[in-house]
Amino acid sequence: MNLRRPNANEALGTSNRSRNVAPVSGICTRCLDGCKGQCDIWLSSFRGREVLYPGPFGEVTAGADKDYPIDYSHINIQGYAQGAKGLPEDTDIGPDTAVFYSVNTETSYGWDKKVKLRLPIFTGALGSTDIARKNWEHFAIGAAISGITIVCGENVCGMDPDLAFDNTGKVKKSPEMDRRIETYKKFHEGYGEILVQMNVEDTRLGTAEYVSSKHNLDTIELKWGQGAKCIGGEVKLKTLERALELKKRGYIVLPDPTLPEVQKGFKSGSFKEFERHSRLGFVSGDGLLEEVDRLRDVGFSRVTLKTGAYSAVELAMAMRFGSEAKIDLLTIDGAPGGTGMSPWPMMNEWGIPTFYLQALAMEYANALKKRGKRVPDIAMAGGFSSEDAVFKALAIGSPFVKAVCMGRGLMIPGMVGKNIGVWLKEGNLPNTVSKYGKTLEEIFISYEELRAKYGARMKEIPTGAIGIWTYAQRFKTGFQQLM
């Protein structure tokens, strides 16, 4: 049985003409000379490297669909009918006290200075992609009122059109980063936090120093990769001027916008977007320890580490050196990938799947514990969207796994809520929404709960944030029922 059929996918806007397809190659069994399209090979014949990336950029998120032999769906949660655990010691255990809605869903992470979460989930890294930028207000306020952490991803300062440098070439002013942080803080209530992620370019630009000195952030995140790819992050650029600007700032821009032939091709319309790529930092134990010490000297009380779906060696390094460095949270992101823009073949065919990666992580965590080493708090990531899978990851990972990082699963409610607000203003509600009502109060099932809490401030809460909060309430209830 094939785990994935190549050569055509909705994410790339490609499909096979033939009803029958060779299973290994994904090529139509009857490939016609004169075919008008459009499989991957057909489209790649004249659009080339464009066909590597899901699209259109800035309008979609994409998730790999390779179906691995084993995942969290292959195990079930085991219940019991005698007694209950977790109730206060002086509680009479019985049908009146062991009720699901009393379950405490809070968790925390951190080596010394803990961060509390109302739910054992937090967002994936929302960085310089257009999806993250355009929806930030919805995502950030939604996370804040839900009491969870939001991760501001890589390259936000470096991509800021209004970025200003000091005389040493470091960040002096970044209005976009300021907006990101201030938006979350406006509704922060003591649960969760905003942490900023750093890659090679961010380090060179002095992003850590900027967010520490101007915003007094407690936490910074180092990045060793992700589950979607083993290269640095990328976005698309729609103008030649923007491509030249970012190349000047030190980014890899392809094709090279400084070449005359490339400029001519862009101006003639042969291609309409440039690719901006980030560098992937090389890792070592000494390097991690030195960088963590440097960041603590800068002023951060917490340093977290995000690592990807690399080999067992890199995972062991992250856990061992993370322990030595007293990392506050180690996020382990498995394959396959979810993305705003990552190469589609790599998202499907690279890296260790999340379930397998967690099995390795638990083996290494127990080995560290047997050696008398403290295991850093761990979060798993990679393909999570529902409370049942989160429950399984926490149960398998107990007591080391404290939370689950959810990428698209937490972005979707923000985008749905945002669009409901837009459709209401336009008077263009689709039937899938209007069957529940014609006003925000009718459509959002818990709207009045939020209004009772925030009163006049409701006008400051965008509908996308209401969507995330509403999803979080469903997650909480479902999670309580499982517990």
Q: Where is each model-derived feature located?
A:
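Hydrophobic faces of well-ordered beta-strands that scaffold small-molecule active sites
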Residues: L119-G124, I148-E154, G192-M198, D218-W224, ...
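Phosphate/diphosphate-binding loops
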Residues: E189-S213, Y356-A359, E363, V433-G437
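Active-site beta-loop-alpha junctions enriched in small/polar residues
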Residues: L126-S128, N155-C157, Q197-T203, G225-G227, ...
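Active-site-adjacent beta->alpha loops and helix N-cap segments on the catalytic face
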Residues: A132-R133, D160-I181, D202-E209, C230-K238, ...
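Active-site beta->alpha loop and helix N-cap motifs at the rims of alpha/beta catalytic domains
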Residues: E193-R204, W224-A228, F271-G285
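Glycine-rich phosphate/ribose-binding loops and adjacent secondary-structure elements
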Residues: F266-G455, K459-I466
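Terminal interaction modules at protein C-ends
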Residues: P257-G265
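Conserved, well-structured core domains of diverse proteins
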Residues: M1-L119, I131-A144, T149, P161-D162, ...
